[in-house]
Regions:
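An acidic/histidine-cluster motif and surrounding catalytic segment
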Residues: 2-117, 121-272
């Protein structure tokens, strides 16, 4: 667990939050309506940030068979590399629906820049001051930017060697990754505080442009991917122009749950 800012709402707003308030058209925190304790913790962690709570789709209100019958959910063509498990849990489906609804709302409302957080997000005190610089470095054509993520923040030589191996054998059909995907697995340098995004997990903190939201909503209709796997698929297949803040600016309460799916909506808010 990383360091965190715990600033009561009445205290001075951190400069990074002031910058984010000015930059984003909307800042949403995805959270179950019944997650009252998490919502209360946000008041201290995000003091000064002008965010709106977005009621997540609750797994208790979902029926897998009905969703499939209605054409709202279909992961029959989702490849194994973009699955956390054989079939998405109801919680993961609820998480995916929640994020997709935000994308749809963004497009319909005409917002240019939206920040999406989840209710277990933790600002990383040591790096958060770099947020204004990272935002300034985004090119006009950006569509997605991770502000926080799990996996591939620091790249070991062994991991780079593994990527080269995947890239070499992918054309032979010997890898789970296709050639273009293998080349995009690891983040690449871009600017002092940004990298071109690679394969990252979690959706606890990211920004999206209107065009990025339009693309993500279309790719997730019907729901076929966990929320974070949707972003991964779009990035590795070159469908979206994505960046990642480096170092990451936000963490989660429980990073150990990240490999399964987004900790907030995919486990406590939704896991089966």
């Amino acid at each position: 667990m990383s360091d965190a800012i715990h600033a009561p709402a009445g205290d001075a707003t951190p400069p990074a939050f002031e910058a984010l308030n000015r930059w984003a058209d909307r800042i949403f925190v995805v959270s179950l309506a019944r997650a009252t304790e998490r919502r209360e913790r946000l008041r201290g962690r995000l003091g000064g940030l002008r965010y709106e709570l977005f009621d997540a789709v609750d797994k208790r209100d979902l029926d897998r068979e009905r969703l499939a019958r209605d054409g709202a959910y279909d992961e029959s063509r989702t490849r194994a590399p973009y699955r956390h498990r054989q079939d998405m849990s109801l919680g993961a489906i609820g998480c995916a629906l929640s994020h997709r609804k935000l994308y749809e709302d963004m497009v319909a409302s005409g917002w240019d820049r939206m920040v999406v957080l989840e209710d277990d997000v933790i600002p990383r005190a040591s790096t958060l001051p770099l947020l204004p610089e990272a935002l300034r470095e985004l090119p006009p054509s950006w569509e997605l930017c991770y502000l926080g993520y799990w996996q591939n923040e620091d790249i070991s030589p062994g991991r780079r060697l593994k990527q080269l191996t995947y890239a070499a054998i992918a054309p032979l059909g010997l890898s789970r990754w296709r050639p273009g995907e293998a080349l995009r697995l690891l983040p690449r340098g871009f600017s002092p505080h940004l990298r071109r995004a690679g394969r990252h997990m979690c959706t606890h903190a990211y920004a999206v442009s209107r065009e990025g939201a339009r693309k993500l909503a279309a790719l997730q209709t019907p729901v076929a991917y966990a929320a974070d796997q949707l972003l991964t698929m779009a990035i590795l297949q070159g469908r979206i122009e994505a960046y990642a803040a480096y170092p990451a600016l936000f963490d989660q309460e429980s990073m150990e749950h990240s490999a399964a799916h987004s900790a907030t909506i995919g486990t406590e808010v939704g896991g089966e």
